[in-house]
Amino acid sequence: MHSTTNNSNKRNNEEKHKQPEANGSADNGEGASGTRNQTAGDTTPEAGTRNETEAGAGARGQTDGASRSGTNAKVATASSARQMDMEKAAETTSTIENVNDVGIMQQKKPPTVIQSRTDVFNEQFANEALHPTTKVIFNGLDVNTEVQPLSDDFEQISDPKGYLTYSVKYEDQFAKKDKLRASEADDRIVGPTVNLFKYGSAVVNIDLNQDFFDTTTGINLTKGILLVQDLLVPIGVTAGAEQSSEYVSGLLMVLFKVMTDNRLVIVGETTTPISNTLSTVVNNILRTTYHNNVGINPALLRDFTHVNWLNQDITNMLQQAGTRFGLGLTATRLDYVRLVKTIVGYALDIDHFAASVLNINLRALMEANVTADDRIKALQAHSMISTQFHGPNQGALRPELAFDHDHVIRCLMLAAANYPRLEGIIVQINTGYVASTNVIRPVSEKRYFPENLEQNQSAARLVSAVKARASEADISSIHLAIAREVSPMFNVHELKKIAESFEDPSSIVVVLEFILFSLFFPTEFNRIKGDIQNVLLLFFSRWYPVEYGIFIQRGATYTINAAGEFEFSGRNEKWDQSSYLSEHFPALFSDVPLAGANTIIAIMRLFTPQGFLRTDDLAIAANFPRASRNPQTYIPYTNQRGTVTNEFASRFRTIVATLANVVNERAVQDDMQKATRSCTKQWLRHLETQFDNIAVAHTDHLSVVYATMSNFMLNFTNNFSGNHATFKPEQYVITSPEGSYKPIMERQGETVDGLTIIDTSIVWPILCQCTYPLVRQSGKGVDAVSIMEEIVYPDPGTTLSQSLSVAQILSKLTLPDAFINMILSGGDSVAMRTYQTEANDELDEGIRMTTYDQYLSHIRERLHITNVPDPIYITGASTPDQIAASVQATHVAVVLYQNGVINGPASTYLRENEVLVVMPDYSNVAARFVYANAQMNNNRYHESVLEIADIFDQADFIQTDNAVRRLRALMPTLSTSQIRHAIERIAQITNVDSTDYGKLTLRFLGTLTRPLKMQNAQIRRIRPDGTVLRYDDQIDIEAFRWSRYFLDELQLRRLAVGLRLIANPRIARRFNGVRIMYLTDDDPDPDFVPAIPEGYVAVQYAHRLFSSSLANKRNRVTYTHPPTGMAYPSPTGRPHVHLTINERAGMSKLVADNIIASVIKSNWVVDILDIEYTAEVMTPSEGYTQHVDAESIMTAPKGKLFHLQFMDGLLRPEPSAFDPPASGEDIRLIYPLQPISVARSMRAIVNHNEVDRPRGAVAPSSYEMDTGTLSRNGDLLYSPVENGQAGIPKLEVDHISFSNVVSMMTSNIRTGDDMAVERVNPSDIRAINIRNA
């Protein structure tokens, strides 16, 4: 998670990386996460052999990373650190209970990472090791808690690499070895530039910087264009299209790399220039300080190049208005409260695309306005209810990205769909927290039976039945069971198989076990109640066959109709847990009276939960992700402060009384011995006493733990409503336009023992083999005396840090999906016409129309995703109010034309509200409207495209749509498997496993499931029957209205820069159309487009112009000349023709050969417009490395992307008198239709006749040298031509600038530092009112 490389921000960096590894270990879903080093509740394999486990008892003194109640919470202070012994402060005292002697022995435990980080902070404070500004801020503050930044996903660098660089091709025969005309001081500034652009450079190109786009991207620049071979793998396309796929793959990989560029620039090594050691030219460009890595820019050639004409050109450009070049410090920003520098601007030699992204990153960080209060709210959401915090507001000195609630919840939903085992990771974090609270721990003394239990056969059978269900106390399983209660569920859970025949009265143990489980864990009970019904029905069939028959006759399942009425199936059917998410319910829990089944109904009422719904108030305050507009968590029980009797204990007494009667009635019916009834009743009374003893621990302590965990960041779904009869979890899916979807909750998901396979027997050790701090305080524990054990308040930094790490890892894991979704979805548009209705209408004014074909292929699929109604069918009688109602209901400004002539008011509404009218076709449009002001003028219309994002009220993304649409037009059609391959290939460069916690998370998440085609993916609810529901703003959260491609605002801003980069002609280098013309070319110019000679006849190619005919006893291709109709069977002697080929489809090889022969023998000029190609300029010393002939171009299949080489012969060496004569002329056939040397910066860096400019030599553009300015809103601007004017934003034009202002952080900004605060724990756990907190 931490990628900071700034040395000044490395405090605790090692501890930060170690923390997740120590606290996040996974153990096959068994709840071990976070319990080895950080928690108090972990036990050794020998747990249960002593009266209390070592780690469990140890928590009474001080748990790892936790603190005691009240004022004792101040572990270490900045002010007292000067006197305290830090080594002693790190020690923790713990106690162990002995089986026979309640004695105390001391044991030393190592501090946890959280504690260590706090100690390190205080030690640094005491030793004057903290940054001076930080020391002032924290002076006098008691520090006992630290939390990592809420968002720390930046890589800090001091020497930024650009996206673009210069590449040079040299002609060695022109090289000179003249000494650089610069002093040693000047050489440090201008040397790299002069050495690169040296005399004899044939061509200087602007290329991608391979140092930034490293080998992991797979980008190959050997042909001068970016190619990636293994990203888009086309299938079912014509041979030859591979190059096109590789080209588009290269664009995509560049785009992704830019979108994920998370670098922040810190001030590195700088120099203050000494003016008397530098030349005047260098002095004039340097500021008060400059970055030591100056970089390369043509402006630095001024006065230092041996090429006279180039020096003069550069000098002239730098002296003209509108070009200002400089290096070094341009601006400084201060924290005016503490009077220290925070941000500085440096002019660097770096391209404006990279500079823009670097500035965007820093601006996003510095303008997030995250305050200490925001951070404290996050800590409070992970702290025991009523915990208070005090911390300074460090402001701009410790900036953080704002926590993007909407983006995080979308990523969590997508990750849950892709990785069902995400549930286990969240449960692990919650399990670690439960363990650290020391709320419960096992003891070796087992209290399953009363000491004076009767010794007879009935008692023996009872003991056997209990022992068959009650296993040895496993504290990890207990912690896991508690954690599951508030954790999200992404897999259907199942009941662990129970083998019970219910033939003996002692089998009532299983029924009691289920009832206890429903009391302790009502949420988890609800998840497996169907499986439990299967067991209970077997019990009822054995014990109450008559009532069972009545119940089965009504049906074992039911559904709830639209009116809220229960409709029973009338069938005897075994419950299948795959039905848990369906519309069916297990009938035993219907709570509907049933005449003749009174005993069954009475027993089933014992399963009624008695907890309450609590709003996740602290999570809401912390802006944590939640999947509901009303985020609530069901708490199994509430604290009982101020009550005379404990309601939880009273409830169990009712259960005991009911079951005692049930056993008694059964015994009477079967004429059982009195001993059977007596021992069962004795056992139940014993359990009642046990329950009385522990009830206060559950209601007054564990309830607070539950309420605390309900606010944790990753517990983002509502768990249970409290009503077994009606509750179904809200089900969300990731949809695609083709109608398929991927559910968030899997009906047939992962099966993990302890996580999704639920063992209800866990209730027995909880009841009979565990102790609790409040129980020990009351004197009812195994100690038999009151032990004032301290309540443990875990450090919230542990779970918050783990949650933040998981959220950021998941965001990275889903980023490749989001990126491909954006590319396949962004830029969707529908072709439309705007019919003008007024004489003076502008192009975009009038009534918008499209056709049904466009509607069905583009708009209707989106309506299908959201399941909204079809737009209204309008007729001549339609009113504006009816149209407005349809637009409001569908959220789409579209209507469907049906018939009639649309009246004036309706026409006016359509025009003024820009409603899109879907027509059968465009024939006779004017006759279908009566416009109030004027008739549509002569069918005047303007053709354009309407963005789908605009139709669906997502206009904030239109800025990227045009570029994305152009990119998509280049892509082949991809199947779901191909899309999945592309996502997986991109995922290889996301660096998710760059930290130990990331590696652990990946390992735990397991296999990725991606059956869904990520295109126009949205998050939608579904009904239990699987029907996808449209977005409902009364139910669904705002984040689900539209997925925003699953990208956050910062990623989208970078993406916009990346799109401009790959669309820039100097980078894209993709061209259309070539001219075939037979010419001699002794001095080749790659950009030369030969003119059409006078007298040539323009002809449009058509198949009918070329036919087969018999001539001179041979079949020949005959050309028919359109102006005269004369046939020419021979390519020789044909009229001079300028043939334009718009579409080559269907052209045979014979015709192509004939046309080329006409070019050679009759001097035809042929323009082929539908060819696409990339171009590479070759120098004389390179020569051609590949050859594409004209015939291949004419007969190639559609979709093939050619790579054509063009020679630049400007620096071809002059032949000497001793060179042999040429054997023939240089003939050339293929020419571009537009200049192709777009990547060129300079050409022919040599002197002609030692002084003059060679013909065709090119100097760099002044834009490459213009530093310009950085605007207040963060835009890089070119220098204005005139004073008072605003400069042109550099991103809005196709020029490329290699001198730009980059904003940098000073060492005063501490982005990687933890935030240190003082935590004040509640004084009394029993005084916390979790209902009103």
Curated annotation (Swiss-Prot):
Subunit text: Homodecamer; each decamer is made up of two conformers of VP2, called VP2A and VP2B. 12 homodecamers assemble to form an icosahedral capsid.
UniProt biased composition (Basic and acidic residues): 11-20
Residue stretches of biased makeup (Polar residues): 1-10, 64-82
One GO location term (cellular component): viral inner capsid
Localisation per UniProt entry: Virion
Similarity field: Belongs to the turreted BTV-fold inner capsid family.
Domain of life: Viruses
Organism: Lymantria dispar cypovirus 1 (isolate Rao)
Function: Inner capsid protein that self-assembles to form an icosahedral capsid with a T=2 symmetry, which consists of 120 copies of VP2, with channels at each of its five-fold vertices. This capsid constitutes the innermost concentric layer of the viral mature particle.
UniProt keyword annotations, A-Z: Capsid protein, Inner capsid protein, T=2 icosahedral capsid protein, Virion
Gene: S1
InterPro entries attached to this UniProt entry: VP1/VP3_C, VP1_protrusion
Protein name: Inner capsid protein VP1
Pfam families (UniProt xref): VP1-like_C (PF21416), VP1_protrusion (PF20855)
UniProt region (Disordered), positions on chain: 1-93
Record's keyword annotation contains Ribonucleoprotein: no
